[in-house]
Amino acid sequence: MATKIYPKLFMKNTAEDYLQAAIDTAEWIDTLVIKTEHGRIWTALPDGQDGYREDVPLFTPKSMYDGSAGIGIFLIRLYEATGNQRWLDEAEEAAAHIIATQVGVEWYDKTLHSEVKGIIPVPGWAAGSYNGPVGEAYFLEDLYQVTGKQEYRDFVLRTADVLLEAAVRDEKGYHWSDQEDITADGGFIVFLDILYRKTGIQKYLDAACEAADVIAKDALDSPHGGKFWKLLDLSMIDFEKETTFPNWSHGTTGTAWMFAALYKDTKKQEYLDLAKAGLEYAMNIAVGDENGRLIPYQDHPVTGPTYDKYYLSTCHGPVGSTLAFRELYDLTGEEIYKKWTIELSRGIVKAGAPEKHSWGFWNCQCQCCGTAGILEHFAAMYEYTGEKEFYDYMIRTADVMLSDSDHRTPGQRTWYDSWWRTIPTRIVSYVGLYVGVAGCASSLLRTYAVMKGKKLTNLYEYHFFE
């Protein structure tokens, strides 16, 4: 018996294991690089894989969701974690291509006012921050903060000015699209507010408030108490008419988060009242107790909340919705919001994650819908609370994330998953930040940073907590 052999399989993962996994992922991503005359982009996924690209309005080459802007944010984090100039150089190459191919107001005119084809035909999402120029601006603002190079801030300001030019004023008010969720117009408002905080330029806050006032008028009284929003017509994507999302990316808690952020900069009481009313609604339809709570996936005026369906990550789950609760606690000091931030976070684990899959937590690893988003959240929750409970959840999730990866090629690592919940057999390896392996590795970097006491660039959703 080889008693002196102690295999690595018996050993616990260390912070260095998480860091090395992120480095190996960056090496894999670089196998898909496309050098351009201006810099670099990446192909969305390896040749021969049956994944999405232009048929989804979030999967475009420069997007923050799946393209070079998001990968660039991951590379900034990798540079911050390692100090290796290579990763910053690659991020700047991605930025150079984005700057050289910057679009104007005509891009919004075309995207918002022509037919959006594909499987998600929603104009506001096609133009929104995860897919369009605003996501590119988030990346370049992050680069500006790291390098101090004025060309990056100049790009951000041009992007914001084009966004203002693209807005319309009509009988509805000041807006861009017919979709008001934070993946569409609400996300533009958040961007303008963040930019105001960073620059102090008043016109950006003024525009954010004017657009937010349109959404404020659309608040609806809920029979459960509080207020909710019907932010878009979900029959566009084959849901029953009048269906609404209660959670973050396309729903009420995301809108509450937006209003809470605006209240911090304006002290306009209506914004605080709307944020509180939105979370009152969410709390009133939630299930669970102090050991774990969840907010249902959908609501409908006839059939009510979907008490058999729950997401667990960012888009429709606690990871996203807790952003609003945490923001309101920071603004008001009212303990109920911190309490719910903690209890919704516990709901993720009570539902079986990260080990157990369920209806709204399937074989998906990404920041948007899956394990990476949960890991990012638990790292943030440990920093926020200092509680060992969330440190342990973070390590559990990081270990599951690492174990689900493919590292058969020495020095490279990737993940395979199903981004589209209703097509579980479509297993591919996307490169992007919110849909793919850059997001997986980025959340491992976040874990490494917490363990080592390092500060990394935040994903945009966490900028308000800086």
Q: Regions from the language model: what does each represent?
A:
Residues 1-466:
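Glycan-recognition and catalytic cores of secretory/periplasmic carbohydrate-active enzymes
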